[in-house]
A protein has these predicted regions:
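N-terminal organellar transit peptides
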Residues: 1-311
Length: 311
């Protein structure tokens, strides 16, 4: 039976939470949520076309990599980044969870056929929750096998948090990196509730329990608490990128969450190399192939082209 998207659940992740996301990502989520939450949009119930918890799965039945070019494992990191898997509807944008990416990396690390790992990144970011944990996992494993962040073509905010933790960051000239910052929006609907005749009475214990409620304007205490959470999330992002990239924290903070083109990202120390994603993947596949059986390198390059066209 078809199921509607759980919009209240999505709203709880989009509003009142620190996000490592660009303004465009947040605007896109709001354009999906707000009309539906206010009853101004009718959904096409097509959620049954995709199974619960659906995500792209480059795993073979026996736990080995499907998206593999010889000794090279390619893991897509696309769309809005979330902490855990959830329902996906055909009206939604592409979603990828941190736990799913970690699972793919773990599988690639355990696969003896895989010599190097590539994260194929095209994302404007997403949730702050879970992002640091994935980045730390990547950072701790890059000494086991090289992990390259191939920015194809965007690695902003949470996506850049992940990319920075990799062994190497490669970006195209027309691609971009950055947005090292945090954003949060609070949705207050008390005036709308008055207009439609809704009244909510909240019973609670603990003075801070209803901080951030959408049914009334933010109190000074609630705003102070939000500012504290934002400072924590921002400082964590800045200090982590500085450690991963070997940069002074002041230099990372001085970017002021700007979005940089490929060449600007390299110049500012956020990326290591400027390259066409297709060409880089082909060359890396050939290099990995040459470490084992040089005569197969042409075949691996052809496989790289085929795989890249699927990403």
């Amino acid at each position: 039976m078809p199921k509607l998207i759980n919009y209240p659940h999505l709203a709880s992740m989009a509003f009142g939470q620190p996000l490592y996301a660009t303004q465009d990502v947040l605007a896109g989520v709001k354009s999906l949520l707000l009309p539906r939450m206010l009853g101004n949009h009718r959904d096409i119930m097509a959620a049954d076309e995709l199974p619960d918890g659906f995500e792209p799965a480059p795993l073979e039945a026996k736990g080995e990599f499907k998206n593999r070019i010889g000794g090279l494992a390619v893991i897509p990191v696309h769309g809005i980044l979330m902490a855990r898997r959830g329902h996906i509807d055909t009206t939604c944008t592409e979603l990828t969870s941190y736990e799913w990416v970690r699972m793919q990396i773990a599988t690639a690390l355990a696969d003896e056929r895989v010599k190097e790992i590539v994260l194929d990144i095209n994302s404007g970011g997403g949730m702050a929750v879970g992002c640091k944990e994935l980045a730390e996992y990547i950072y701790s494993k890059r000494s086991v096998k090289p992990i390259t962040a191939l920015v194809n073509f965007a690695a902003y905010s949470a996506a850049y948090f992940i990319a920075a933790a990799c062994t190497k960051v490669v970006v195209s000239e027309t691609g971009g990196c950055g947005s090292v910052g945090v954003i949060m929006e609070h949705m207050e609907v008390s005036k709308w509730e008055q207009e439609v005749g809704l009244t909510f009475t909240t019973f609670y214990r603990g003075e801070r329990k209803k901080d951030g409620t959408p049914h009334e304007p933010l109190s000074e205490g609630a705003m102070a608490a939000i500012d504290h959470r934002m400072d924590q999330a921002y400082n964590l992002f800045v200090s982590s990128v500085a450690r991963y990239r070997g940069l002074p924290a002041e230099q990372v903070q001085a970017t002021e969450a700007a979005l940089f083109s490929g060449s600007e990202a390299v110049a500012n120390g956020l990326a290591d190399e400027l390259a066409n994603p297709q060409d880089y993947l082909n060359a890396l596949a050939a290099s990995v192939a040459n470490q084992g059986k040089p005569q197969q390198s042409v075949g691996f390059r052809a496989k790289a082209i085929e795989l890249q066209n699927q990403l």
